[in-house]
């Protein structure tokens, strides 16, 4: 019998969907190596491999059979995706054009040889970032530069603004995936994109207020408020928006600081200075990464208290998703302080979910973990923290939790989302 690869769903799926992988037609107990590869839009090659042994019927199902070694070991049905590593140092897998899929090649090789044995079977699978029927609408309204993703149908849908960090530009992959779950999601750029500022030393909340107004006025967006989804600097900005602006019902804060960092933030007659930092506190790891976790001043001490975001003004529901090994900044500390501050002012206690051995970039499911990555403000890659498997598990859980949270607070219901390792 000729070996064949079985993938479910067949042919294509959304990136955040689990993929069932099985091989049939092998010899009983046959040792094989499974290998995956994809290229991103910049030409970087991402690969993973794992060694397996077929069962007594010559079949191999990754949901039931543990890997014996390779890029990972143990029972990891999605390991061949989340364990991928780039052929370029410190290169993160980022989908830049969500209108095209990542094409994943899967090969089955005979034996457990490091360089691969005879090719037994091969399959190609497309991993899409826009579910069928999701619409992509570029937004250039007033000063707002963004892309709005709308689910199939007429709506109205609960609205979310999606914000990333200091890398700048316009990243759409999280918004496009989330639109497939029934949300109208606007990926919002705020610098280093189109005619927006090229630097981030000054930010005006009026720009973000304009984005909120635009989204709430859209005929396919359900009011009375919108949700915010932010990571890193985007999470910090989400907290500022929730504190100063109207129309924010719920906010998911992924590894964010409850203090204004790097830039000076202005809103009308008020301003928050950037928190002081000491670059001499940077440590360099044995691998040559910069560990910046200790460079920020403690915002609870004068004069740095002026940089604290006035969360007590907000009536927004908050969900903090925290990587406990985040080395970008002390995310768990900031989440705990936010909870204390909100409760001290009679506000609702926020949800805080902490993930052990999880680093800074908590992404949608199955996006590979990175130990370190370049940073706009440093000349060497900075340490992001985390461990591959724990980080992968955290991403699956966080993706489910944020959807449930938004459905609860923006739609008034609670829907589970199918995702698993």
Curated annotation (Swiss-Prot):
The keyword Lipid metabolism applies. GO terms for molecular function: carboxylic ester hydrolase activity; fatty acyl-CoA hydrolase activity. A motif (Microbody targeting signal) lies at residues 419-421. Induction: In the liver and kidney, by peroxisome proliferator, via the peroxisome proliferator-activated receptors (PPARs) and by fasting. It is found in: Peroxisome. One of its GO terms (cellular component) is cytosol. GO terms for biological process: acyl-CoA metabolic process; long-chain fatty acid metabolic process; saturated monocarboxylic acid metabolic process; unsaturated monocarboxylic acid metabolic process; very long-chain fatty acid metabolic process. Pathway: Lipid metabolism; fatty acid metabolism. Its EC number is 3.1.2.2. Disulfide bonds: none annotated. It is an enzyme of class 3 (hydrolase). It catalyses: hexadecanoyl-CoA + H2O = hexadecanoate + CoA + H(+); decanoyl-CoA + H2O = decanoate + CoA + H(+); octanoyl-CoA + H2O = octanoate + CoA + H(+); dodecanoyl-CoA + H2O = dodecanoate + CoA + H(+). Keywords: Fatty acid metabolism, Hydrolase, Lipid metabolism, Peroxisome, Serine esterase. Catalyzes the hydrolysis of acyl-CoAs into free fatty acids and coenzyme A (CoASH), regulating their respective intracellular levels. Mainly active on medium-chain acyl-CoAs. Seems to be involved in intraperoxisomal regulation of acyl-CoA levels, but not CoASH levels. May have a function in termination of beta-oxidation of fatty acids. This is Acyl-coenzyme A thioesterase 5. It comes from Mus musculus.
């Amino acid at each position: 019998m000729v070996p064949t690869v079985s993938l479910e769903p067949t042919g294509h799926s959304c990136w955040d969907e689990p993929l069932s992988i099985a091989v049939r037609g092998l010899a009983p107990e046959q040792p094989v190596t499974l290998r995956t590869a994809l290229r991103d839009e910049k030409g970087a090659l991402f690969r993973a491999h794992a060694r397996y042994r077929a069962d007594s019927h010559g079949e191999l199902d990754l949901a039931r059979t543990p890997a014996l070694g390779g890029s990972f070991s143990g029972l990891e049905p999605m390991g061949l995706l989340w364990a991928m590593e780039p052929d370029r140092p410190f290169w993160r897998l980022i989908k830049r054009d969500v209108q095209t899929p990542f094409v994943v090649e899967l090969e089955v090789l005979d034996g457990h040889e490091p360089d691969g044995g005879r090719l037994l079977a091969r399959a190609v699978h497309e991993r899409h970032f826009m579910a069928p029927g999701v619409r992509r609408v570029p937004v250039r309204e007033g000063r707002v530069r963004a892309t709005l993703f709308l689910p199939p149908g007429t709506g109205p849908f609960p609205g979310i603004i999606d914000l990333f960090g200091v890398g700048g530009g316009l990243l759409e992959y999280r918004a496009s995936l989330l639109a497939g779950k029934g949300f109208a999601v606007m990926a919002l750029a705020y610098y280093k994109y189109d005619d927006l500022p090229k630097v981030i030393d000054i930010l005006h909340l009026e720009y973000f207020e304009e984005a909120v107004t635009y989204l709430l006025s859209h005929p396919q967006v359900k009011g009375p408020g919108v949700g915010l989804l932010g990571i890193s600097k985007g999470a910090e900005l989400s907290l500022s928006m929730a504190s100063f602006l109207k129309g924010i019902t719920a906010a998911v804060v992924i590894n964010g600081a409850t203090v204004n960092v790097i830039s000076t933030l202005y809103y009308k007659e008020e301003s928050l200075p950037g928190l002081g930092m000491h670059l001499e506190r940077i440590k360099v790891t044995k691998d040559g990464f910069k560990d910046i976790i200790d460079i920020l001043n403690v915002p609870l001490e004068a004069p740095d208290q002026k940089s604290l975001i006035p969360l007590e003004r907000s009536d927004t529901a908050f969900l903090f998703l925290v990587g406990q090994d985040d080395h970008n900044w002390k995310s768990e500390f900031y989440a705990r302080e936010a909870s204390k501050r909100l409760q001290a002012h009679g506000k609702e206690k926020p949800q805080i979910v902490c993930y052990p051995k999880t680093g800074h970039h908590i992404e949608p499911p199955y996006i590979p973990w990175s130990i370190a990555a370049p940073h706009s403000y440093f000349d060497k890659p900075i340490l992001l923290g985390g461990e591959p498997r724990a980080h992968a598990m955290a991403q699956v859980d966080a993706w489910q939790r944020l959807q449930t949270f938004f459905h609860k607070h923006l739609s008034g219901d609670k829907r589970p989302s199918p995702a698993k390792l």
